[in-house]
């Protein structure tokens, strides 16, 4: 009788363990943000502008969704982008951001595997450009 109970318990444990190992990793929604400042630009600007971006990243679909605002810029934003690059380094445009010229903006994009890896590794930043600061007026590293 004890042997039967032990075998049944062991079988149940092994089946549960195998099921857990066979189940694919669960997708997660990661909350992210970027605080936009002139001092974060490379090189820094003397702008009084500021801004913020909040974002969510779905690790299964690789969809990045964002909302942001900018204010106090030297003039209207002429462009805004997510760039690939570590803090203190400039990098290429990864995803354009529409609507920053209005002061507030939102959007979404589906990332490639390489882009998703860079984003999750802290190697992306948001940059807002103006006519007076063509290379970028305010910038913020995207963090979790």
Question: Predicted segment positions?
Answer:
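Metal-centered catalytic cores of metalloenzymes
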Residues: 2-17, 22-80, 84-144
């Amino acid at each position: 009788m004890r042997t039967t109970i032990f075998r049944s318990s062991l079988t149940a444990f092994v089946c549960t363990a195998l099921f857990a190992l066979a189940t694919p990793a669960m997708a997660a929604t990661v909350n992210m943000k970027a605080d936009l400042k002139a001092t974060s630009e490379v090189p820094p600007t003397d702008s009084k502008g500021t801004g913020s971006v909040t974002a969510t990243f779905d690790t299964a679909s690789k969809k990045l969704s964002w909302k942001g605002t900018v204010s106090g810029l030297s003039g209207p934003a002429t462009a805004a982008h997510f760039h690939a690059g570590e803090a203190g380094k400039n990098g290429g445009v990864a995803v354009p951001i529409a609507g920053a010229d209005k002061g507030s903006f939102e959007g979404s994009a589906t990332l490639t595997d390489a882009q998703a890896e860079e984003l999750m590794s802290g190697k992306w930043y948001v940059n807002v450009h103006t006519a007076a600061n063509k290379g970028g007026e305010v910038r913020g590293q995207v963090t979790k």
